[in-house]
Amino acid sequence: MRFSDNLAKILDKYENLGNTLSSGIMGDEFVKASKEYAELEDVVAKIKEYNKAKSELEEANNFKLEVGLDNATLEMIEDEIYTLENSLPKLERAVKIALLPKDDADSKSAIIEVRAGSGGEEAALFAAVLFNMYQRYAELKGWRFEILAISDTGIGGYKEASASIKGKDVFSKLKFESGVHRVQRVPETESQGRIHTSAATVAVLPEAEEVDIKIEDKDLRIDTYRASGAGGQHVNTTDSAVRITHIPTGITVALQDEKSQHKNKAKALKILRARIYEEERRKKEQERADSRRGQVGSGDRSERIRTYNFPQGRVSDHRINLTLYKIDEVVKNGQLDEFVEALIADDEAKKLLEI
């Protein structure tokens, strides 16, 4: 089917859905039609803009052929033709991007998990830096950042930390952050001024609702124990810490941040549901023809994706060969948009090649 025929078909479908919604349908039929109609709104707006530019270009070319035009009018028409001819490829690309298959999880909120990797205490300190960077980015975007759990080292580092980030399209923005982040800097305890390299792992999971993942009580094993602080000492006398294991998948989540066992259980279930949902998404995507490996930000947590070099003041993303020499703005102020937008654009470009 030709590109123009495909666009006409989409416009017809949109119009028919609008007529259906106006006909007074109710119940599940109305819900289904409303959902389809809303999903098409963005692409239809882009198609109409593209068709309008094509029509205006055709009119301008026809007008140019008319006899008796003065030089000023002819120059004005040629300027318009030049502008329209330059805008059409961009408008066509915007339509094609809007037509790309959507990741159902893109519109969801997210759970982010940061874990210290190789590098000992320096890695734990870097994990804390990354976690705080994402918190500041969430604040800049107007998202709600709720800390779920932090396992600290007692001197400012995080062995691991997790948070729920709520807002529109959070997962679509943050999903490319999954992977190994490497830091190169001189630790405060380094007397010789030598640069040390350490790493932390980031995992970004779409936050799953109960409607996405149904977890049966019979599939859970819940253990309770006393919470412990740094050094292993018990910090309270009740069994408030919770460990939940999803028996079918073997996925386990342990939480002890809250003094209330009930709150720890609720947070642990939230993380567990997100991990199970992400595992199911991964399996489905691997079954599809589109290999995850062929896309930017595959989400492979063993993939080294970014290096933060403090002595040189640079942050380099290895997937798209983008280096920014403003490490403080990125790390301390959470200004991640240049990386986020570049990764999304690169992902879209690769998908367009597959059409």
Swiss-Prot record:
MF annotations from Gene Ontology: translation release factor activity, codon specific
Subcellular location: Cytoplasm
InterPro entries: PCRF, Pep_chain_release_fac_I, Pep_chain_release_fac_I_sf, Prokaryotic/Mito_RF, RF-1
Biased composition (Basic and acidic residues): 280-293
Keywords: Cytoplasm, Methylation, Protein biosynthesis
Residue positions where N5-methylglutamine is found in the record: 233
Renumbered residue ranges of the record's region Disordered: 280-308
PTM entry text: Methylated by PrmC. Methylation increases the termination efficiency of RF1.
Listed PROSITE patterns: RF_PROK_I (PS00745)
Role summary: Peptide chain release factor 1 directs the termination of translation in response to the peptide chain termination codons UAG and UAA.
PANTHER family: LD18447P
Family designation: Belongs to the prokaryotic/mitochondrial release factor family.
HAMAP family assigned to the protein according to its UniProt record, in alphabetical order: Rel_fac_1
Protein name in the entry: Peptide chain release factor 1
